Amino acid sequence: NWMATARWACRFLQNALLVDIGSTTTDIITLRDGAIRVRGYSDEARMRYDELLYTGVVRTPLMALTRHIPHAGEWTTIMAEHFATTADVYRLTGELTGTVDQSPAADGGEKTLSGSARRLARMLGTEAESFPLDYWQMNARFWRERQLEPIRAALERHLSGGGWPADAPLVGVGIGRFLVQECATRLQRPYRDINAIFPPCISTPAFSAADCTPAAALVCLASSRITGFPDDDPN
């Protein structure tokens, strides 16, 4: 999957870090001088080199993010149980749209703000009704920070190799690319959305190619082999 994305992107981008944050995993792909420059090809090697992180914006259990979270003025130890997922976090922050919110909730319950608040509360051993909804929306932002930390650290590792032009962007890919934009701001790097290198006909108002980039990239790569469309211009 990641190789299809990389092969399509390197036609248009000379130097960039592609960051594909999906429902379950995050792929970090280095493009240098218009070529794919990765160190690992197996999952084991890619995890060793921070090219594959098992963290995503829908299915990741919250217990995988941290052992403690701020709550009611204290650092609270969380439940080591699969009571809630990152989908609950981004549902509460308003960053998870219905079109990509396709996995069942951890408890099989409703995928609503109140349902997500209930699941976050359970991670802390309390009841959602003990606090107003805006409290749980604030609490969700704490969880969001815990997920950003390892992603940002991995990006810092890749950028520390040196030789990156000042205009080399972080390219946001996948349903969690809103986190890539956040990382770009914090790391003071340019940001570019992967949609910019796809032909307009690939996306529709109800469908974004960036949400399933590997599939869209395969379509474009196949089209370019068969018809010559589009080899060097996404427009």
Please provide the spans of the model-predicted regions.
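Helical "lid/coupling" subdomains associated with nucleotide-phosphate turnover
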Residues: N1-L18, D27-N235
